[in-house]
A protein has these predicted regions:
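N-terminal secretory signal peptides that target proteins for export/translocation
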Residues: 1-8
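Intrinsic-disorder-associated interaction segments
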Residues: 9, 16, 157-160
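Residue-level detector of intrinsically disordered/flexible regions characterized by low predicted structural confidence
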Residues: 9-11, 210
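Bacterial N-terminal signal peptides
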Residues: 13-24
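Sec/Tat signal peptide C-region and signal peptidase I cleavage site
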Residues: 26-31
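Acidic, serine/threonine-rich low-complexity disordered tracts
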Residues: 32-133, 176-282
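Active-site/ligand-binding surface loops and adjacent short beta/alpha elements
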Residues: 133-192
């Protein structure tokens, strides 16, 4: 049962990983975490519909919202990202999910702080990550606090010569990278803090495709695969479809799980920095 809860959490929460799509190059990202914001502005608000395949029938199971706001962090200019994903009252009967993720990055898009409060089934946990930089080395301190069931907190610290991201700061920085030089089959590698550990992540660029969202609009998208490797075999976990324009917004996600499939569709967006030039005229 615990494994099923974890998998369902990943199915509805993996929307966050959409930001992983835009790290450039096949080489690991260097420790330099500074970048110029070329993609978003304060006030951006994006909504998604979440679906799950239950016995060959697609059922709407919830919503997710992602907001971006200018703020300060330790008295310095910063951006704050909030992502809320919640199941509907109907699906609460089978599995209750309320996830709230908050991330702060500097005005130069350096990861600063990450927090995930997750109410999933009967479990309630809070994951936190604090980022620091010294002499070209990135360090992250992580802590998981268990509120239900009550357990001892789990803590860890990790340093890397590369930049370390969390699930939201990667979205903030990577959306500004230019993907025009990507080649089909190209692999993108980087470390990411998950709240309890730092894991190596792999994405593969698959090409372009036209995708219809839940706002009756078709978008020209770049397609990426998030993959895992087990015993030397490649397994596709998520397929991302991202707008082929300056906004680089996730339009659709397909998630392949041991117990079924899940999808997330763009429902609405406002406050985007650029026109959605990826829209395909019908």
């Amino acid at each position: 049962a615990g494994d099923t809860v974890t998998k369902k959490k990943q199915a509805l929460g993996l929307l966050l990983l959409a930001g992983l799509l835009w790290l450039g190059g096949t080489m690991p990202v260097q420790a330099q975490c500074v970048a110029k914001n070329e993609a978003f502005q304060s006030g951006e608000h994006v909504m998604y519909d979440l679906y799950f395949n239950w016995k060959f029938i697609w059922k709407k199971v919830g919503l997710a919202s992602l907001t971006t706001n200018g703020t300060t962090y330790h008295s310095k200019p910063a951006y704050r990202f909030n992502l809320l994903s919640a199941g509907s009252k109907k699906t609460d009967f089978f599995f209750k999910m309320r996830d709230t993720l908050t991330c702060y990055v500097s005005d130069k898009l350096e990861p600063l702080y990450f927090r995930k409060a997750a109410e999933e089934g009967k479990r309630y946990t809070v994951d936190e990550a604090w980022f620091s930089y010294n002499d070209g080395v990135a360090t992250v301190k992580q802590k998981r606090t268990w509120h239900n069931p009550v357990r001892e907190p789990q803590e860890m610290e990790y340093s890397d010569s590369r930049c370390i991201f969390d699930m939201l700061s990667i979205l903030a920085q990577a959306r500004s990278y230019d993907p025009r030089d990507y080649k089909v089959g190209e692999k993108i590698l980087f470390p990411m803090a998950t709240g309890r550990r730092v894991e190596e992540q792999t994405l593969i660029y698959r090409g372009k495709e036209e995708i219809e969202a839940n706002n009756d609009t078709i978008y020209r998208c770049l397609v990426f695969s998030f993959v895992e490797y087990k015993k030397g075999k490649e397994k596709e976990v998520i397929t991302f479809f991202v707008s082929d324009d300056k906004n680089h917004l996730p339009i659709r996600l397909d998630m392949y799980l041991n117990f079924g499939s899940a999808k997330a569709f763009l429902k609405s967006v406002r406050g985007n920095r650029y026109p959605m030039t990826s829209v395909v005229e019908k």
